[in-house]
Amino acid sequence: ESAPAPEVSGDAVFSAIQNGXLKNLGNAFFW
């Protein structure tokens, strides 16, 4: 609980791009 999972980093970022408005930012980063 105290220590964050290593997968959370990538998963959270991807989730934020998919659910957030960071789609433009994600596009520039992933594409």
Swiss-Prot record:
It is found in: Secreted. Keywords: Antimicrobial, Fungicide, Secreted. One of its GO terms (cellular component) is extracellular region. It comes from the Eukaryota. GO terms for biological process: defense response to fungus; killing of cells of another organism. Antifungal activity against C.albicans ATCC 76615. This is Antifungal protein 1. It comes from Musca domestica (House fly).
